[in-house]
């Protein structure tokens, strides 16, 4: 665990040092849980969004996109339940004056019990080797059985309390489990209370005439209120989907773990509208399709897992998370939910407008059911960096840090490097750069030794480095170096476009989804 925490700190430092992520307003000492994306971060983020957008709207004839406004009529959020129920249960430690989410404190305690069980299993696996039967060990070992029984009892109480919105019971679980404040080490807790997460502001020129509005806490409602607009103007037939990428805002009291949980963040959501009664079959299909999309990135299938929800939101009849193994444990990067017809029904009720679909095949009108896929772009960004960040020791004891990003997502696709700045090599390198830059995001670098320049490109994840040397001036060939293997190949300049295009195009990534 300590090693993973150290790795996470290195990753955060790497993001700042190499222009991926900066603390926002840093010259004013920053703003808690708010970050800016730097010159390489914004390119990686845009490439991720393009991979998702094309995977949805380009590869599916029945999915289209919209871009809804951040400000919406305040009744939208009343209808969706956000005004009354978009809350977090908060608890304060009287000694440290620190505020925590009560549910997160309990979840962290459960995770510690899981770690105890995992350590017991790992020790036994090393002891017994190939003959080890994990299932039998878990069911028969007294220590594991004790930990599991403790965990199950706490989890059952926790689930009941969350479902019943029982704040007193949440506090009692914290007391009974002897959960301490990480800062003060004491158990001097206040009562648990609810805190609404929406940012409110006013729209209008005078205080008396101003309307209270909200920064949207999710992008989904912009899709639901535009259901009829898109369906009618696009002549869409069910099943069909509407996709959107956009900013959302939540007044997170406990924002932590770098860009994993922020107050301003970006979502990629797709709402898929289906016939009532067919939603669970579509939920299963989208569940597998979304996992395939993530694993297609090549970061390792074992790094991903499903986490099915035991506690369902009031509007859902099925829900699962796709989790990725971050340096701080498995965490959600995407949610897939069967939202039933709750959202459209609520907006029909509050707006007084009929929001239904006439199904010509069935000869009847109905309120469609919805399957939602929802990704936090910033979380996805962090998972990609965590999976790509690699420290290597090379022959001769030299080391390097390399971001083994999927080539199609890399911020810079290729770097053009003259071996030296004299004898026309720099001019030749710039000529090659201008030839390629209309199709690829390129970088030119002539400063420092060629080895140091390779290391800089490795650190930002550039898949290819093209070296222009004296042989180039004689026979129009260059050396092309691949980031992951550091292998070098001599190729003619007129083949560069063909070689690089095949390996870094988004198409090469999208074809893996077929």
PLM features: what roles do these ranges have?
Residues 1-514:
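NTP/phosphate- and nucleic-acid-binding module
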């Amino acid at each position: 665990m300590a090693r993973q925490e150290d790795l996470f700190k290195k990753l955060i430092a790497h993001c700042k040092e190499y222009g991926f992520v900066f603390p926002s307003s840093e010259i004013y000492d920053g703003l808690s849980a708010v970050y800016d994306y730097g010159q390489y971060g914004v390119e990686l983020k845009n490439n991720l969004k393009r991979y998702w957008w094309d995977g949805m709207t380009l590869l599916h004839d029945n999915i289209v996109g919209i871009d809804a406004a951040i400000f919406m009529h305040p009744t939208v959020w009343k209808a969706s339940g956000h005004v009354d129920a978009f809350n977090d249960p908060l608890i304060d430690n009287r000694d440290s004056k620190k505020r925590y989410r009560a549910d997160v404190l309990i979840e962290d305690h459960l995770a510690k019990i899981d770690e105890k069980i995992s350590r017991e299993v790992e020790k036994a696996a090393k002891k017994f080797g190939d003959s080890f039967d994990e299932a039998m060990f878990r069911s028969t070992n007294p220590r594991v059985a004790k930990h599991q029984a403790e965990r199950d009892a706490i989890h059952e109480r926790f689930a009941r309390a969350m479902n019943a919105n029982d704040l007193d019971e949440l506090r009692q679980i914290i007391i009974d489990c002897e959960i301490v404040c990480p800062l003060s080490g004491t158990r001097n807790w206040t009562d648990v209370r609810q805190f609404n997460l929406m940012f409110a502001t006013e729209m209008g020129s005078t205080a008396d005439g101003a309307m209270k509005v909200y920064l949207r806490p999710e992008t989904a409602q912009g899709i639901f209120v535009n259901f009829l607009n898109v369906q009618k103007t696009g002549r869409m037939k069910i099943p069909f989907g509407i996709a959107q990428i956009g900013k959302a805002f939540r007044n997170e009291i406990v924002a932590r773990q770098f860009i994993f949980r922020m107050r301003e963040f970006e979502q990629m959501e797709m709402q898929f509208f289906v016939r009532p009664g067919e939603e669970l079959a579509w939920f299963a299909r989208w569940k597998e399709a979304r996992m395939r999309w993530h694993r297609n990135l090549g970061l390792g299938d074992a790094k991903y897992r499903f986490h099915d929800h035991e506690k369902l939101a009031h509007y859902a009849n099925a829900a699962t998370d796709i989790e990725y193994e971050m340096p701080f444990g498995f965490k959600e990067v995407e949610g897939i939910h069967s939202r039933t017809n709750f959202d459209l029904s609520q907006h029909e009720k509050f707006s007084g407008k009929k929001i239904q679909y006439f199904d010509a095949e069935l000869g009847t009108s109905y309120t469609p059911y919805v399957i939602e896929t929802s990704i936090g772009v910033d979380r996805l960004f962090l998972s990609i960096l965590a999976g790509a960040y690699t420290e290597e020791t090379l022959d001769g004891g030299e080391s390097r840090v390399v971001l083994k990003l999927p080539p199609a997502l890399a911020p810079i696709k290729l770097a053009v490097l003259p071996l030296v700045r004299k004898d026309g090599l720099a001019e030749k390198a710039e000529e090659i750069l201008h030839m390629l830059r209309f199709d690829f995001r390129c970088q030119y670098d002539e400063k420092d030794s060629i080895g140091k320049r390779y290391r800089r490109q490795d650190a930002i994840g550039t898949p290819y480095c093209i070296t222009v040397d004296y042989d180039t001036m004689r026979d129009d060939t260059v050396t092309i170096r691949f980031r992951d293997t550091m292998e070098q190949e001599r190729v003619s300049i007129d083949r560069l476009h063909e070689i690089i295009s095949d390996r870094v195009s988004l198409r090469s990534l999208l074809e893996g989804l077929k």
